[in-house]
């Protein structure tokens, strides 16, 4: 369910059944991981690991949270908007990513990201966050130094973008990813309207795409990946 409250309740059920047989807790995101950590694992000193490197989880490493994985959200957010910026400017897609732009923005392939030509996709690379390095990740909304330079508006003029987040209640998306997007949009001269979905229905998002003609570009985060036609049918009109 990816739901923190459900995870907190689940650990109570599991401990009632298994008690001290539980040696480690591993969660697919920090929202659920922190819920189980606070509800039971912290007091019982059971190592708990999550995913996303949310600020509260990173801070909790000092209190016994076992660790988490940074999705390099600062790179993810930059790549999302940078690909749009390059398309709008009509420049090579790799500009400011693997190839320096005029402002000096450039990522390191193999360290920060990888590119799949076959899939035509950029992927931010994960980083383990542990007791040894967690202090480097305490601000999850800080832009990445390598790509923090302002673009020249005479070469990259202001453009308007419609961007949705499929679930506004998701801890990572709302507390880390969207704030990072908002920190990058000004650097890339993009005026972005952010739309938060309910995580359940596509119509909760598409109903707020009433006038696509006023936008220069779109970044779509679908609830279900087989629902692309819900958006293309609107954008093709």
Description of each model-found segment:
Residues 2-59, 181, 218, 223-236:
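Hydrophobic alpha-helical
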Residues 21, 64, 213-216:
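Short loop/turn motifs at secondary-structure junctions
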Residues 152-171, 175-237:
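Alpha-helical recognition/docking segments in bacterial nutrient-uptake
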Residues 1-12, 26-32, 52-55, 71-77, ...:
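Hinge/beta->alpha junction and helix N-cap segments in small-molecule ligand-binding domains
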Residues 79, 83-159:
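Hinge/cleft segment of the Venus flytrap/periplasmic-binding protein
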Residues 58, 135-140, 170-175:
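Short, solvent-exposed loop/turn elements at domain surfaces
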Residues 23-27, 38-110, 131:
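Exported/periplasmic ABC-transporter solute-binding proteins
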